[in-house]
């Protein structure tokens, strides 16, 4: 439609584009018409739009005075729309191939999409290939996608007549009197949208895996068949993502944990409980020792609390009312106890054990505390989601005037630690929700301290309005690994609840009792989870200071065993974590095994090394260091490790 430069006439509408320019179109014009008025290329590329910030289909009519944005597959919002529409395409293919399948929900998620189906027989990998092939046929058919609005009663009748009882259940729970549906050929689905104009816009997709999922996430409900997939704007982006997925499979911490003999799980022990093998336990110990050193450097006091505490204490803290479904309980001599799911309460007791003065503050209590949480079996995942884990928990108790400096100190701590491990990270501030406790002054002070620390950090951050806990605002810190995946690790959480519930006080300069400000914080979070992330980040190739085994002594033949044994003892007694392989095997075989175990250095002992009293360190990538005395290698290792100790 042509642009009018003289202004609107009766029946025209005026809309504003993101750059501030205006367009005048005839009344009843749609998002697609607006795109066409700008250019034929944009009209062809348009997949959806935004009217006053609300996403709509390209067929949505424009309103006078609206601010309008055209969404293409290159837009920030475009990928989610592509993925959501591709989930509908998958559901259509499933219904054609498996007519008795019942459809449930199929949202876009961070890495793609999924759809849950109620099927008589779980899908096989061969079924997955058939579904994907049918999706390609439907995409090539260029089937228009059309939006339809029905009353709730009409929609219930439609889906009930189709035998789609899950959709009926969803609709009946909706508060709206009308609902929107999307049709593409013989398939119809309940959805708010928006969606692609036609199936031909689904150009690059792949079904990736099968899984089970309970309806509404409730184990009491029926197990459904979940199909995962992903979609992108073009094949190049899809191929790059699929290669990343293959690399992630090679780095899977569960796979490497077995291959490197770090840890295991056993049905005899129970799901979600890790058994640490010698090398895994050493890795964990190194990490925990690192944590203790770093905390002591920064003025934290190391404390240790018991594993079980009286049920009355959990009732007093509020955990019993709000968290007991995730707790384990036991009884001792008729007295109820709760196994701790977090470490806060012992720290409260330490604070209350004596009268505190403002001169004592800030107090920083740090504990590598093992906790137990009842996680559903369906969400357990290697080290990343377990039922027993250790957290690097700390609680800072300070005066209101000290809060700013304490928050900045924690962010500086996080920055230092993430730098040591080579992680980039993102920060998010979650602010006061509608339902909260604490005064306006408390919230303003705490939020201001968190926000000020974020600004002073010089790093980008996001604000999640209203997403804080009811008892205080927080900063969440998410690290990015070598595959650009995000992982939640550090948290800085202000808490107005526990100091009140436990009547924590200090005496100020005027002799009056005041309530301290409390900050919960973790740096690495769950040690188990962080180790899982480390394994995948480094692909098992841990840096020298963190490697459970730093070197292995290899003999070429049996003749070198006496000298090789001396080398081994020299390294071991001087603190190098060393193994030996004196087996009567070919050297190439032993080197290959050491490389598969990802040991940083191999010390090959042949006749030349015996004669010269040296070792020739070979790095795991195949490169060699110059020959050196065993004592020189010890010094080399210690110098490398000292940088992190």
From Swiss-Prot:
Compartments reported by the entry: Cytoplasm
Protein known as: Threonine--tRNA ligase
Region (Catalytic): 252-543
PANTHER family: THREONINE--TRNA LIGASE, CHLOROPLASTIC_MITOCHONDRIAL 2, THREONINE-TRNA LIGASE
Pfam families: HGTP_anticodon (PF03129), TGS (PF02824), tRNA-synt_2b (PF00587), tRNA_SAD (PF07973)
SUPFAM superfamilies: Class II aaRS ABD-related, Class II aaRS and biotin synthetases, TGS-like, ThrRS/AlaRS common domain
Any single Gene Ontology cellular-component annotation: cytosol
Principal location class: cytoplasm
Keywords from the UniProt entry: Aminoacyl-tRNA synthetase, ATP-binding, Cytoplasm, Ligase, Metal-binding, Nucleotide-binding, Protein biosynthesis, RNA-binding, tRNA-binding, Zinc
Cofactor: Zn(2+)
Subunit-level organization: Homodimer.
Family: Belongs to the class-II aminoacyl-tRNA synthetase family.
GO molecular function terms noted in the UniProt entry: ATP binding; metal ion binding; threonine-tRNA ligase activity; tRNA binding
The protein's Enzyme Commission number: 6.1.1.3
Domain TGS, first and last residues per copy: 9-72
Cofactor: binding comment: Binds 1 zinc ion per subunit.
HAMAP family: Thr_tRNA_synth
Catalytic activity entry: tRNA(Thr) + L-threonine + ATP = L-threonyl-tRNA(Thr) + AMP + diphosphate + H(+)
GO biological process, one term: threonyl-tRNA aminoacylation
Function: Catalyzes the attachment of threonine to tRNA(Thr) in a two-step reaction: L-threonine is first activated by ATP to form Thr-AMP and then transferred to the acceptor end of tRNA(Thr). Also edits incorrectly charged L-seryl-tRNA(Thr).
